[in-house]
Amino acid sequence: MPSVSFEDSTSPQRQALDWMLGDSYSLEELKNDGDDRIVQRFALAVFYYSTNGPTSWDLENRDGWLLSSTECDWGERSFGPDVECSNNNVVDRISLWSDGLSGTIPREIGLLSSLTFLGLSRNNLEGTIPTEIGVLTSLTGFSFSRNANLSGRVPTELANLSNLEVLNLSNTQLTGSIPSSLCSTLAWAYIDCGEIECDCC
């Protein structure tokens, strides 16, 4: 991960840090849980601020995040949680479909190293897919479809995702190609063939 400046008080990273420093759970309950839990909480908070959680997320989602409790309780809703965890409080799934997300996907997503699924379809995300997606080697599926302003080239680091089975990048402005090394694992891929080359799609 690249170094991050916290001097800009409006940056998602600084906002996440300020929130954690004012959150009793972050300061008290996590102090005996080790660095991994602190990093996970920080990464999710950065994601929230980077995708404009306080201003553009749907109200139910907005009120369900940055709670003074375990991250595994965030985003609990009647039809399914935004965040799912393994038994040891490690986040392994994020599902935020049609929830009003805008802004950009932060590089800190790569800190959530146990993610198996990342679903961010039907939102208003822009910018590029961060190259740090390539360190999420446990991913079996991710969907960023119907984010019309998501642009740039598909990261070549996708080649590292040797467990990837499901990929949806349709209805975006992404270009480039899908690494041929994924052909042996992909069971389902939905992309814009006119913009993204794929030998196995």
PLM regions with names:
Residues P2-T104, E195-E197:
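LRR flanking "cap" motifs
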Residues V83-C85, N88-V90, E108-L115, L118, G134-L139, N147, L167, ...:
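Leucine-rich repeat
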Residues I94-L96, T116-L120, L139-F144, L164-L169, ...:
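Conserved hydrophobic beta-strand positions in leucine-rich repeat
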Residues D99, N123, N147-A148, T172, ...:
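Conserved "Asn-ladder"/turn position within leucine-rich repeats
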Residues S102-G110, E126-T131, S151-T156, T175-S180:
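The feature encodes a structural signal of leucine-rich repeats
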Residues A159-C201:
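Leucine-rich solenoid repeat scaffolds
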